[in-house]
Amino acid sequence: MPKKEIKSIKSHVSCPRNFKKRNLQDMKHKNIGATESKILSAFIKKSRNWFTVSDAYSLFPELSENAISIQLARMTYDGLLMHICKGTYYMIPYEQDSETFMPDWHLLAEPLVGGEHYIGYYSALQIHQLITQPSLNEQIVINKRIKPSEKAIKGVKFQFIYHNPKHFFGYKKTWIDSFNKVLCSDLEKTIIDCLYKPDYAGGIVEVAKAICMSKDKIKYEQLLNYAVKFDSQAVVKRLGYLLELLSIPTSIIDELQKLRSNSIIVLDTELPKQGKILSRWNIQQNVDIETIKNAILT
């Protein structure tokens, strides 16, 4: 299909929230196949920017899934669609070059997983505007294991991090721009997750910075409830330690003290197990206090 013939349709997919505001009738006057027109129109009307072969097949029960797959492959070749993963396609905005187009990768979490998930760890810190260095690594928390656990799409690594049912909670639809929402851990759960696995959050220094930056937004009772529900000594001890180190006045510190056990955990999982033991929190301080404080001040 010539590029000029698909211009009208591709203009509809530049922004999912604007799909319904566009006039779909002009597609009838373009030299576009009936199947292509029906597929794109259906998902534009639903404000969908991605779909599966099965979704498309439901529009044409008289055709085989193989025939639909061939049609979608042709549309991909024509620059209408981007192939995300097996059986899943993303609609490409007209103004974008199909060879280089890459949507905001937060939007690819749902089509890649196709089930329950949320964006977490360092990626969630980015959505909550708590980091200054964006990463080409999207971290997606899942409650069912996916193999392989990583997938690369046009230079962006998507990492699927498994959480057991006990740890899979505390997420909601969150705005990432003026038009789109994604499932992301809320602020308090983001902090809990990052304390559990600091290596997925850029290290304990990044976690400390995030807590300091959001200290006036954090719901501390919610944070405590999450820590209790998560039921991890590493979370309890790192959280209590950092709240005291950052001089954040909150009564949950006393509650965290009551929850701590006698076992020793390291402050930062990315660094060697060395440094003095802080008996108040039973933490091995393998990161210098000044390193944390200086990072917060810069």
PLM features: residue spans?
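Short gly/ser-rich loop at a beta-strand->alpha-helix junction or flexible surface loop bordering the NTP-binding
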Residues: 83-95, 101-167, 283
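Short beta-edge/loop segments at beta->alpha junctions of small alpha/beta modules
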Residues: 24-115, 216-236
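Short coil/loop linkers at secondary-structure junctions
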Residues: 62-64, 131, 249
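Short, well-structured alpha-helical interface segments that form or flank functional binding sites
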Residues: 51, 67-70, 119, 186-190, ...
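Long, low-complexity, charged/polar intrinsically disordered regions in eukaryotic proteins
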Residues: 1-26
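Hydrophobic alpha-helical interaction segments
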Residues: 2, 172-298
